[in-house]
């Protein structure tokens, strides 16, 4: 009894998340690839990132690799501590966070979540991935889990929802450069895709 979906899952592969697959429990090159999820639950293998302005920590479940060496775990922890510090910086003209996160990928994910009114889109099932390399950035996506989509009857923004702790986006949206990126992403969508959406749906 219930509703079941047959769908692709999210995993590292050439036709899925196309990044270098990092070996489990390895010290070979801990810079990547990584596939992680900001998770609702702290039951799966994860690291915890302390969030001083939240009622709970940010739980980062690692999907690939699945088993971490001490060096892999240390690298992942350092990466997300650095992301937290850069995103929650008081100076919203800082570009430090852009050295860690792909801004336009985050803007695209934000537009999708906002259009879908997915209130828990930055609370759980919030995937990020990073390819191998010291200078590669974390890329938001792929999208997953729209169980609470179209459920926002308060006509507010998804990051402003007391029901769910929305991680990262509640401060990322305050950066003027991110706001401009969101305008550009939505403008491109409205100009190039929205006009032909009915035709696409009818195919």
Identify the residue ranges that each predicted region occupies.
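Catalytic-loop signature of eukaryotic-like protein kinases
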Residues: 118, 123-132
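A generic fold-level signal
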Residues: 104, 121, 134-136
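Short, solvent-exposed loop/turn segments at the edges of secondary structure
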Residues: 2, 31, 123, 164-167
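Structural recognition of the beta-strand scaffold that forms the well-ordered cores
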Residues: 2-8, 34-37, 108-109, 127-129, ...
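Internal "kinase-insert"/substrate-recognition segments embedded within catalytic cores
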Residues: 2-111, 119
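C-terminal catalytic region of ATP-dependent kinase domains
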Residues: 66-70, 77, 117, 133-203
């Amino acid at each position: 009894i219930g509703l079941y979906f047959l769908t692709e899952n999210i995993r590292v592969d050439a036709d899925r998340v196309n990044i270098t697959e990092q070996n489990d429990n390895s010290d070979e090159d801990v810079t990547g690839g990584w596939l992680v999820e900001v998770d609702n639950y702290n039951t799966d293998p994860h690291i915890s990132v302390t969030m001083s302005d939240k009622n709970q920590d940010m739980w980062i479940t690692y999907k690939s690799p699945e088993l971490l060496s001490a060096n892999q775990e240390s690298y992942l922890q350092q990466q997300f501590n650095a992301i937290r510090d850069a995103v929650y910086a008081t100076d919203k003209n800082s570009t430090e966070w852009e050295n860690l996160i792909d801004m336009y990928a985050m803007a695209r994910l934000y537009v999708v979540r906002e259009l879908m009114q997915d209130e828990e889109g930055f609370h759980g099932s919030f995937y990020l991935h990073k390819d191998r390399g010291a200078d590669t950035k974390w890329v938001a996506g792929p999208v997953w889990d729209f169980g609470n989509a179209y459920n926002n009857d308060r006509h507010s923004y998804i990051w402003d929802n007391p029901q769910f702790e929305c991680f990262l986006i509640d401060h990322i949206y305050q950066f003027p450069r991110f706001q401009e990126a969101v305008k550009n992403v939505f403008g491109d969508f409205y100009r190039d895709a929205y006009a032909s959406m009915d035709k696409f749906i009818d195919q």
